């Protein structure tokens, strides 16, 4: 009976320690970061945005939450500007601005003690506005599309709080503009952006 009680106590102690350890391990993976950034976004392919603008450039801020082991969630907001290079294509409108949100999941790989790579897959929303040249108001449209990319991360301090992040991403853009001719509809509503970003990341 004494041996049975000792054995039972040992099992209870091991189980309690194991559960405590699992809980501790899970919470140890939770990390947050904030990323002020600058971006350049180039339209690719045969489409209205590629023919109308040189490129988009902007700045913004992002946040990441590492939830479990190497997986996490992130969001970025960027305010973009662009210059019109072909007024005939863009119509009676001035240079546009764009509000962009990128929502994504990421997986982080540790390459060395100071160097990491993040793989990203998510969804983007866009709101583009352009003033009419006669100052009578603004034209605006909203749209969205998938995004996927990769980030290279380098740690710049001994504690691991500060990092420099270089990213490249493909953003798919779909404005859903209808036309009886599907080629014209695709030309004015669909595009792919090649996105380059540079950010300072602070982890906490």
Question: What is each of the regions a protein language model found here?
Answer:
Residues 1-24, 204:
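Bacterial Sec-dependent N-terminal signal peptides
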Residues 19-76, 80, 201-203:
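Short glycine/proline- and aromatic-enriched beta-strand/turn motifs that initiate or cap beta-hairpins
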Residues 25, 46-52, 88-94, 135-141, ...:
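Outer-membrane beta-barrel domain signature
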Residues 32, 64-146, 152-160, 202:
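Gram-negative (and chloroplast) outer-membrane scaffold detector with strong preference
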Residues 41-45, 80-84, 124-128, 169-177, ...:
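Structural signature of outer-membrane beta-barrel domains
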Residues 54-58, 98-100, 143-147, 191-193:
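Membrane-spanning beta-strands of outer-membrane beta-barrel proteins
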Residues 148-204:
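Predominantly the C-terminal beta-signal and adjacent terminal strand-loop region
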């Amino acid at each position: 009976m004494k041996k049975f009680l000792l054995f039972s106590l040992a099992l209870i102690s091991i189980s309690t320690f194991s559960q405590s350890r699992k809980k501790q391990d899970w919470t140890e993976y939770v990390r947050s970061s904030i990323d002020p950034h600058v971006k350049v976004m180039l339209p690719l392919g045969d489409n209205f945005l590629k023919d109308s603008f040189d490129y988009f450039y902007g700045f913004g801020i992002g946040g990441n939450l590492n939830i479990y082991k190497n997986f996490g969630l992130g969001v970025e907001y960027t305010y973009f500007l662009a210059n019109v290079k072909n007024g005939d294509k863009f119509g009676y409108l001035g240079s546009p601005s764009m509000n962009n949100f990128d929502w994504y999941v990421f997986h982080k790989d540790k390459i060395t003690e100071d160097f990491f790579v993040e793989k990203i897959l998510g969804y983007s929303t866009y709101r583009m506005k352009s003033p009419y040249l006669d100052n009578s108001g603004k034209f605006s449209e909203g749209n969205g599309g998938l995004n996927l990319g990769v980030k290279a991360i380098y740690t710049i301090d001994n504690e691991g709080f500060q990092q420099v992040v270089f990213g490249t991403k493909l953003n798919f853009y779909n404005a859903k503009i209808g036309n009886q001719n599907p080629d014209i509809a695709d030309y004015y509503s669909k595009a792919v952006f090649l996105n380059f970003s540079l950010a300072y990341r602070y982890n906490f």
